[in-house]
């Protein structure tokens, strides 16, 4: 495929896509903002602990590949970054809002079921029902300039197939290692995680507001 990302590049791109929609008042992001987004403990799988230098290296690489661009100007002393991965003025990759939400969630969390994707992507796009989620996934799997996602074999004991993005190469279709979380219903767990993410976002906005008032 034309678009190939390493695991760290996928995390950076996913974070910028997410923040562009969920916290537009804080977008574009500074290096520190990208570090914080990459190392979030909510809506990230796996949870990472990247250093500023590691993130800066990814940002520099992605700028060279024209997947990001730097933004600076009057009154903007800190270099900030915005994504050009999709829906940019001169870019080839055009995605609908629903497709962006699903791709972003897959970049940030890896393989997931349609039910998990619907709950976890809700802050970026409100799917009307499961049929819309599944039809959007099928569109991404069958696009002429793709495919961008693939449906994986159903895991033992699971009701739904998982889907995975293909921006980091072919996916080894192997069941995940069983752990305690498998005992919890996937949809319910995803909803709880979505609420945790929303609380974290609200706390981040409150901290930012308090810091601004304190200046």
From Swiss-Prot:
Keywords: Acetylation. InterPro entries: DUF480, WH-like_DNA-bd_sf, WH_DNA-bd_sf. It comes from the Bacteria. GO terms for cellular component: cytosol. PANTHER family: UPF0502 PROTEIN YCEH. Belongs to the UPF0502 family. This is UPF0502 protein YceH. It comes from Escherichia coli (strain K12). The gene is yceH.
């Amino acid at each position: 495929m034309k678009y190939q990302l390493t695991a760290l590049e996928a995390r950076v791109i996913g974070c910028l896509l997410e923040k562009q929609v969920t916290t537009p008042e804080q977008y574009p992001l500074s290096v520190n903002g990208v570090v914080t987004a990459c190392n979030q403990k909510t809506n990230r799988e796996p949870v990472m602990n990247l250093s500023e230098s590691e993130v800066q290296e990814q940002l520099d690489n992605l700028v060279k590949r024209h997947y990001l661009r730097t933004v600076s100007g009057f009154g903007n002393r800190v270099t900030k970054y915005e994504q050009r991965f999709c829906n940019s003025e001169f870019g080839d990759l055009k995605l609908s809002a629903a497709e962006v939400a699903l791709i972003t969630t897959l970049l940030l969390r890896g393989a997931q079921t349609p039910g998990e994707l619907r709950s976890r992507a809700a802050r970026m796009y409100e799917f009307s029902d499961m049929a819309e989620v599944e039809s959007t996934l099928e569109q991404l799997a069958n696009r002429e300039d793709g495919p961008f996602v693939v449906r994986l074999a159903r895991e033992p004991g699971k009701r739904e197939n998982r889907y995975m993005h293909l921006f980091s190469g072919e996916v080894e279709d192997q069941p995940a290692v069983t752990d305690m979380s498998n005992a919890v219903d996937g949809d319910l767990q995803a909803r709880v995680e979505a609420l945790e993410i929303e609380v974290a976002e609200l706390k981040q906005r409150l901290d930012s507001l308090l810091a601004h008032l304190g200046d």
